[in-house]
Amino acid sequence: MSTKRSKSMPRIVPADEWQTARKKLLVKEKAMTRSLDALAAERRRLPMVPIDKKYVFDGPDGKVSLLDLFEGRRQLILYHFMFSPVVSGWPSAGCPGCSLVIDQIGHLAHLHARDTSFVAVSIAPLANIKKHKKRMGWTVPWVSSFGTDFNKDFGRTTEPTDKHDGEIFGLSVFFRDGKRIYRSYFTDGRGVEAIGTVWQLLDLTPFGRQEKWEDSPAGWPQTPPFEWWERHDEYPK
């Protein structure tokens, strides 16, 4: 086996020197953790917006309201899943990037233990959703907002722009007080990375995400962002 080192690799050092460098990085990592804790504390204190409009979705067992999606719990995390004619693979498949996100949602028992439910919502008809959900092997609750104002009201279906084709993914958080519902938080774009393990794991590796925007050593493999994302059964074997 060849031991020749690539010119683009970082310095190769003895274990004690590596430990010293690692400890310096750890100081910064701990500072970042404390900053994120402080940010989360601010997020918990954001003002909330009441949701007075009645929304009804198509679920696997019939019509369900936004209140029903809480399943009796106080909190609801809702992923706005892109699934419309502007999405690659329509009408048989949902957005590849959104599929990557849902692949990373773990067993919901852990959220339920903290009085929190999770659901995905798409504007696609329920039949399309069922087909893609079965193909992907998911158990995550997923309902259809087809024929409702839900996507438009929450800014997820809009007029096309130079940045998107008219449908946008995102993550909303709702809070229930009795039968009153409030929207407490929303994020989209890179904010959604917070719920994904793929990006966090890749960030721990020497190559990183291997995307062109990253500051990596010269010669490290990089491709345009998003373009490498596929539905999990579409990657080259």
Per-region residue spans from a language model:
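Non-globular targeting/processing and membrane-anchoring segments
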Residues: 2-114, 131-137, 141, 148-237
